[in-house]
């Protein structure tokens, strides 16, 4: 797995990098601006990412119901306007211990385990690792696809 945190929006070079992966995981908070940024990123990835598999992870959700509702609405919008299927990859709950750990400059998964957010990350990571397609990613993963997409015979001097 390679994690690319693009913040709001996505740069052209980041799109090429992400498009070389077998799957992109969009992480979104349940805030209008974050949802708009995730949709804009999705639109760019659909235009340049080819057959890239897509998933949505909701961060800082008040509840599982809020995360599910956000995924369903995002999926409906993505399917209607972009023809994109977005898998639900779970959620990480809003957790006051995260803010406290940031103030103390300590990773929250180490500062106060088991916090709700740390447990959420563990569940998401476990689900990603258990997926059957992981064994196949080695054949078509990031670096294999990057080599296919780039013309490495021409070098910039």
Segments the model singles out, each with a brief description of its role:
Residues 1-16:
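Switch II (G3) loop of P-loop NTPases
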Residues 2, 24-25:
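Short, well-ordered beta-strand core segments
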Residues 35-54:
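Conserved C-terminal guanine-recognition region of P-loop GTPase G domains, centered on the G4
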Residues 107-157:
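NTP-binding/hydrolysis catalytic cores, primarily Walker-type P-loop NTPases
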